[in-house]
UniProtKB/Swiss-Prot annotation:
Native source organism of the sequence: Novosphingobium aromaticivorans (strain ATCC 700278 / DSM 12444 / CCUG 56034 / CIP 105152 / NBRC 16084 / F199)
Keyword Hydrolase assigned: yes
GO annotation terms (biological process): dUMP biosynthetic process; dUTP biosynthetic process
Protein name in the entry: dCTP deaminase
One Pfam family hit: DCD
Enzyme Commission identifier(s): 3.5.4.13
Catalytic site positions: 133
NCBIfam families: dCTP_deam
Gene name of the encoded protein: dcd
Family (UniProt): Belongs to the dCTP deaminase family.
Covalent S-S links between cysteines: none
Function: Catalyzes the deamination of dCTP to dUTP.
Top-level lineage group: Bacteria
Amino acid sequence: MAILSDKWIRDKALNEGMIEPFVENQRRDGCISYGLSSYGYDARVAPEFKIFTNVDSAVVDPKDFASNSFVDRETDVCVIPPNSFALARTVEYFRVPRDVLVICLGKSTYARCGIIVNVTPLEPGWEGHVTLEFSNTTPLPAKIYANEGACQFLFLQGNEPCEVSYADRAGKYMGQRGVTLPRL
């Protein structure tokens, strides 16, 4: 499995719509960096957040998730309460080629502040906005900045296309738009 370069990412984004909108050069002046890097793409977080709250003393159940456990906010700066988390999404819409698996890693700028970004791999054939989970591991409120870098996607090419892609098996998160809660 090979990690794919900026040249490959640029070509797929510009000619096949793999990443839309696509920022060709890494932006970093006065903001958390985003855009094309040497062997990856730093995606931005959209100004659409679901901030976890437990006012109803709910039990978190991935099989029966209570959507009222979140407060919806559209804002340029999201404040996550101490030891809590928020869901968000990428500005970018991704279309993953059939022979590629995409891994996401958090930005060190956030990690150094105790803010962890979690995303499961983007499977071959999947497309959509990526739902991001920001965990505030600190005992203090933490800020997330919309329209700035949130995480880096690394593109890994398999030795051959998979037999059954995410699209082939009609995965439950196929084509998701906006922040998407757990589905069964």
